[in-house]
A protein has these predicted regions:
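Active-site glycine-centered loops adjacent to acidic/histidine catalytic or metal-binding residues
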Residues: 23, 73-74, 101-102, 185, ...
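Short, solvent-exposed beta-strand-terminating loops
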Residues: 11-36, 104-108, 178, 182-202
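N-terminal active-site segment of His-dependent metallophosphoesterases
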Residues: 1-84
Length: 275
């Protein structure tokens, strides 16, 4: 696992550091799973061969540094009892703040990732996250934690939407007047990210949606509330950075006209110093 060091300037009284990681994609199963389920996990594990090793590295690095840590979604690849048990122990041991990703809703009932199963997972997402929530200490759909005078806000956007409840809670935090680091799984659309040939953003504009397949439009088209929330996020001076994952690449916004985003990729532990 590589460590990428980033410095951000917020004008805090006392500089501090924290860690961010994302998209570990754990694939644990046990004797309670069917052989077909275990074979599916082995196949998925070939796509994420360092998942368990990365979790161990993070444990050691948090213990060594004492830095707070945020995970921005897809801690597990799909839901199994073994994955949930591991996540509970891992999060409690590291004190990790967790934001849900799109895989925290993934049942994969037919032991495959396909549009039909994914659509079913989306429809029962609230029920699923209610059950998954029991294994995490913070609210994985909306959470706020103050560190060093900065509000760390986590919003679950794993369904490519922001709910009215999340939006209202965000506005309440903004009203406190403190600088905000906003953690989400899926990054906001930006021309920079589009130039890297990725098509998995929050609130892509209509001109981009016009190039998508019908399935991508179904998955990613933002509703009016989400569009309003994204415009609000872009307009708020107190929201200093959006920090996220999902794309499996490392990226930091360079264009000064775009909202500042930090995207962290697979097998990366980002160490962020706030000054």
């Amino acid at each position: 696992m590589q460590i990428v060091k980033t410095q951000i300037e917020l004008g805090v009284e006392k500089p501090f550091a924290f860690l961010q990681t994302t998209d570990i994609h754990l694939v644990f199963t046990d004797e309670n799973d069917t052989e077909a389920r275990r074979e599916f996990a082995r196949a998925r594990g070939r796509d994420f061969p360092h998942a368990e090793e990365n979790a161990a590295f993070i444990r050691q690095y948090v213990a060594k540094t004492g830095y707070p840590i945020v995970h921005t979604g897809d801690l597990m690849d799909f839901i199994t009892p073994a994955n949930l048990r591991f996540c509970r122990e891992f999060v409690r041991e590291t004190g990790m703040m967790v934001v849900a990703g799109n895989h925290e809703q993934a049942h994969c009932v037919n032991n495959v990732f396909c549009p039909e199963d994914y659509a079913g997972d989306m429809k029962r997402r609230d029920e699923t996250l209610d059950a998954v929530q029991a294994y995490f200490d913070n609210d994985i759909r909306f959470t706020c934690r103050e560190i060093g005078g900065v509000n760390f806000v986590g919003i679950d956007n794993g369904n490519y939407q922001i709910s009215q409840d999340q939006f209202e809670k965000l506005k309440t935090v903004v009203a406190e007047g403190k600088p905000i680091l906003l953690f989400m799984h899926i990054p906001l659309y930006s021309k920079e990210l589009q130039a890297r040939h990725y098509d998995c953003y929050l609130a892509p504009p209509e001109v981009v949606l016009a190039t998508y397949t019908p399935w991508q439009v179904y998955e990613q088209k933002a509703d009016e509330r989400t569009l309003e929330a994204c415009a609000y996020i872009r307009s708020q001076e107190l929201i200093k950075y959006v920090i996220c994952g999902h794309l499996h690449l490392d990226h930091e916004t360079q264009d000064p006209t775009e909202i500042r985003q930090i995207v962290t990729g697979l097998d990366t532990l980002r160490e962020i110093t706030v000054v």
